[in-house]
Regions:
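Phosphate/nucleotide-binding catalytic core
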Residues: 1-170
Length: 170
């Protein structure tokens, strides 16, 4: 947690993925400034050992990393749930239940007034497809999936996707 504000940098699901959670801001540029500053410090530290953060939807070294969850009941439960796909033998599920530890995405939470709620929702709905393609997807070289949106396949053809309300744009 930052000493100057409520920003937090934490591990998301596994120790391979960092989450940046920012305090409320009046302008998105304020968040961008803080993100740029944090990223610069982190990249400098990681660079000392020839590592770096990359903005990819799938960790490029997913098959070499320790994909165990962060020791937290929430993440341990998530990974156990995803692993149920091995025993349920449901049709059309992929064989990578550990994917929760090496894929990442983006989330945006905005505070909006009642007056502009509908227009804000409409704008975000219009950019959702582009946002998903640009920020949350990647190729997955270990599979026969000939796509640049492998993150969607991980999600939709897993235990997450067996519930229709968890997959696609609803």
């Amino acid at each position: 947690k930052s000493k100057e504000n409520e920003d937090r940098i934490l591990f998301e699901v596994s120790y391979n993925i960092l989450e940046f959670a920012f305090e409320k801001a009046t302008k998105i540029q304020e968040v961008e400034e803080r993100f740029t500053e944090y990223l610069s410090v982190i990249q400098s530290i990681l660079g000392e050992d020839d590592h770096e953060l990359q903005g990819k939807g799938i960790h490029p070294f997913w098959d070499k990393n320790d994909n165990n969850p962060v020791q937290s009941p929430r993440y341990e439960m998530l990974m156990q749930y995803l692993s149920m796909s091995k025993t349920l033998k449901l049709k059309d599920l992929h064989s990578y239940p550990e994917y929760g530890a090496f894929i990442c995405g983006n989330q945006i939470q905005l505070d909006v007034s009642k007056e502009n709620f509908i227009s804000v929702i409409n704008v975000f709905n219009q950019i959702e497809a582009a946002k998903a393609y640009l920020f949350a997807n990647s190729e997955f070289p270990d599979s026969s999936w000939n796509t640049k949106i492998a993150r969607d396949i991980f999600w939709e053809q897993s235990m997450h996707g067996i519930l229709q309300e968890n997959a696609g744009v609803n």
